[in-house]
């Protein structure tokens, strides 16, 4: 969709899809009157500048100043934006003037006058200087624009904003600099705001379903080969076979509610190691999220939603200026949601608010303050899962229904709350150096009272273990960096030098109640009410549990240089991290058959770890849009486990080789990418087979594969995303052996032990494919109506470390529609209806299994909303 510039009844639009994200300034009604243009000339593009024209130069110095430019032949509007970026020149022209026109190529060192004359050669257009603006007109028209008053600064697409349609061309993910994706030598994928609007994901996992290299439905899995065995923010997604970490505005988050989609402008996926810029990260990559912040143009939107399972939702998102000049702006996003789920007695309830304010202190200094609060008394997840006999394998009475709840309605509490404060500060000292800083404080708490599944007694009955958990955490993080540019002859440098720290404190308590026979339930005909919780560590209660208190401080220093010589871009970076686990106290309370209770308290020694990570890559941009690249990068994750002798483990260390292609198809807004990679990770941990209370270093995991993707605004009313991923993740070096699991034997898991070496990592699909399209037909009879749909395929996954059984593959279909009321009735401008249906056929499928349970995928979900923008 085109962003809009407010005028007297006419939209100011950019023609090229690359420019649709240009933030349009407000043009007052007096401007339109002063221009005296017809309605056909009311659409204006203004590109910032400082230069002169052929007719009335501002100054001799400005006219004669020379610039080195290299702009290939392309759409005229794109060439003008490139010239503006290269020279700092401000251009004003009506979009009708550039429609269908192509520019001539320019290359060399020349003045703005010479560059404009060459670009416009053969287009039938000329230019003249009007005040401080270069105005384009038809050579024969002699149309003269009056003074242009612009309320705001027009710039190209924001590197942290919502993107344009399904495509984003610029990003800060992976480099912390505003860089075109086609100049970064590694895999980065952007989920734009429009894609989220069309697909209606309720959380980040659902938003990631169409992203290459990401398995977003691995709920409830525990990956032995995954790099991150810490809190993964309630998510079950994997990147290139490794569990992932989430970052908000560049800082790692441990929030249990991270990534409320109603609060996000975009989601950025960096596949591959990213430790150089972000510290502790898995070799699979990171998930970056950008919170909504005040916009330069007013924004007002509200919506009400509905859906199956009793869903009702309301959201609001408003942004406007506070001061008359607009140097102080605010934004407020809020959500209220209540609904059931496909499983009885499992509900989702949430209220949240995200206020923010931006103060442009002066032309060089800006400060943004954000705060958020999310209260989720029911998080809608059913982590208990179901037995494999009755889901993965045919049961005596068929499959267990998705609606089946195997817990107790009176012992069923899953919820969390999170509070956060953040500020982002920037100051530009001069054209060479600027300073950027991000700070966040967040506090999160999660509670869980459920019954987890234990042994399956027979074909119909299974034993449950009552469980209660309480996790609270507090995180303080800051990232401060100097960013700058300089040239060494024909070579340009875009450098970053920075430091960040993160202080994380967590307290985790848990208790199991081994009640016995009263906790057994029939999986096909559950009867509730037979269980009464008994917790207290007394001889009357058969409970076992403990508490852990953990504190970590991490600090890192990093540097990066993006070197560019003509069409060649080279990326070099390095980082050193120091990690201190300053406090690790564990208290274990357990059963004793003699006196009924025993208590064990232990205080673990603190540990210090450090690691150096680095990366290097290069990418070459051919003039016809192709950009091949190669990169090498490393990662690390500090580990908190201890072996049976009380010794700490080495950090998880990973490295990746990646080779790929990026192709921006000329004359289109279509970005195609392909990447092949090889990742290895050392020192992953498993439970010590000789002492199950401790961990053991299992060895090395290798993941290799390739990804292809497309993000495309094919034409004005047709957008698409598509991807294919192949992942081969294996245990390549290990001394660990595991039993062959026999899911038919109910309690029998005593098969012969075999080595895990060479086996596939469990719950990692080798093949994934997806495609999603949205189309609004231009026909008058269907004016305002749009349709969309998608296909998702996930290959089979092995369910244990020795690959003795597997969960089958599945194919899902999603469809949707939307209607713009204003397209047919002008009085209803801004009113829009939306419908999104996932898993259209209501397919029964399994996302993953382990040796104790399987997890069912979501059935048919129907979401709709009505939104109004004003």
Where on the chain are the PLM-derived regions?
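Outer-membrane beta-barrel translocator/receptor signature
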Residues: 263-265, 276-355, 361-365, 419, ...
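Membrane-embedded beta-barrel scaffold of Gram-negative outer-membrane proteins
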Residues: 426-428, 434-440, 445-450, 651-713, ...
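Acidic, small-polar-rich N-terminal luminal/periplasmic segments of exported/outer-membrane proteins
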Residues: 90, 105, 146-297, 302, ...
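Surface-exposed extracellular loop regions of Gram-negative outer-membrane beta-barrel proteins
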Residues: 236, 377-389, 503-508, 619-663, ...
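Conserved C-terminal beta-signal and adjacent last beta-strands/turns
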Residues: 494-495, 657, 759-870
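Acidic/polar loop-and-plug regions of large Gram-negative outer-membrane beta-barrel proteins
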Residues: 337-341, 353-360, 364-428, 432, ...
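Structural signature of Gram-negative outer-membrane beta-barrels, strongest in the C-terminal barrel
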Residues: 358-362, 473, 492-504, 548-681
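Gram-negative outer-membrane beta-barrel transporters
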Residues: 567, 678, 697-800, 844
